[in-house]
């Protein structure tokens, strides 16, 4: 590890932020701090993560949602002080790192299949009842 990577790791450790493990295709809720005049409030922005870029302190992710029939994309720096929290609501099954093709799709064709978790009990049979 070179000096710059080491310094970045130290800065990330100082920030003390817990970032969930999410990938493109996952539906996330990003709670963003919005300053209006003197007061600050938290606004939820929910959408599909369509890509991640960068690394270390400079890592960004793009979230796309449909608002009033219009597609809206927003790029968030992961370690931004304006981000209050990130929550993953749904895991998506995709085969691409960048989901820019979703920009051209509407309705059912823009849906992303849900990814089954490896450690889940959904695929296992129910235990037999003891007699």
UniProtKB/Swiss-Prot annotation:
A biological process from GO: translation
A GO molecular-function annotation: structural constituent of ribosome
Keyword vocabulary terms for this entry: Ribonucleoprotein, Ribosomal protein
Stored HAMAP family: Ribosomal_bL19 (MF_00402)
Biological function: This protein is located at the 30S-50S ribosomal subunit interface and may play a role in the structure and function of the aminoacyl-tRNA binding site.
Family stated for the protein in its record: Belongs to the bacterial ribosomal protein bL19 family.
Name under which the protein is recorded: Large ribosomal subunit protein bL19
